[in-house]
Amino acid sequence: MTARILDGNALSARVRGELAERAAALADGGVQPCLAVILVGVNPASAVYVRNKVAACEKAGIRSLRFDFAADVDAAEVMAKIAELNADSAVHGVLVQLPLPKQFNEAEVLEAIRVEKDVDGFHAENVGRLSQGQEAFLPCTPHGVMKMLEAGGVPVQGAEAVVIGRSNIVGKPMAMLLTNAGATVTVTHSKTRDLAFHTRRADILVAAIGKPRFVTGDMIKPGAVVIDVGINRLTEGPDAGKLCGDVDFESAKEVASLITPVPGGVGPMTITMLLANTVESAERVARSKG
């Protein structure tokens, strides 16, 4: 068996085309979707992520605003900028790129963003709504995974799903979304005993731990759907400098029925769902204007 590849680039391009049409319709009605991005410090990876988000906004017809702060900025200055953006009716989404320098309390910063502009889906109120199965802005990576499962024709209801990783950004919300969709979900992590026992039971396996090529083919149930959220740059060996996921793609593809590659899998859909949340926020504003 050789797995079918679930192409995140192709799906992302299709969804972004639809979002561009929605953004254009909003602009014609006098509401141009707008995303404000705050970047603190000079983390190279964060800078790349922000550039990619801004570029994606431009292509989709979404206005973007970028605010850069030095790494040693007083936290109060960033909080003041968030308050300013919260009050700006022309801004529909506010995003603070993580991680933040040590002088910041990340939870306080995320809570400072108005719920209706929290297009990253990290505000506690949005997380609470998600846990209750209520309408909310969904965290972008788990939301993107669900869209990929849907596009791949994967039956989630009744499936055994295993999530490797319990982060607030991916693991926990991923488990909630799968639960809300009717899957029986197991969350595994660094303290899990006999991880492979759990992964071999999974009809749907989501890896999100940040360990390169950690999940190997012998840990996967034959015919399983494997979603690789990880993105790691190898630092040694013949593949040094290359990007890879948390799954050993070569061995996994011989066991799984469907698998996402890295790069070109979940990553593009993460940014696409950020655009989707921003457009949805703008549409809510447009509806409120009648």
From Swiss-Prot:
Catalyzed reaction equations: (6R)-5,10-methylene-5,6,7,8-tetrahydrofolate + NADP(+) = (6R)-5,10-methenyltetrahydrofolate + NADPH; (6R)-5,10-methenyltetrahydrofolate + H2O = (6R)-10-formyltetrahydrofolate + H(+)
CDD domains attached to this UniProt entry: NAD_bind_m-THF_DH_Cyclohyd (cd01080)
This protein's record includes keyword Nucleus: no
One GO biological process term: purine nucleotide biosynthetic process
TM region positions: none
Annotated residues for binding of NADP(+): G165, R166, S167, S190, I231
GO cellular component: cytosol
EC number(s) from the headed UniProt entry: 1.5.1.5, 3.5.4.9
Oligomeric form and interacting partners: Homodimer.
Primary role: Catalyzes the oxidation of 5,10-methylenetetrahydrofolate to 5,10-methenyltetrahydrofolate and then the hydrolysis of 5,10-methenyltetrahydrofolate to 10-formyltetrahydrofolate.
Protein name: Bifunctional protein FolD
Organism for this UniProt entry: Aromatoleum aromaticum (strain DSM 19018 / LMG 30748 / EbN1) (Azoarcus sp. (strain EbN1))
Gene: folD
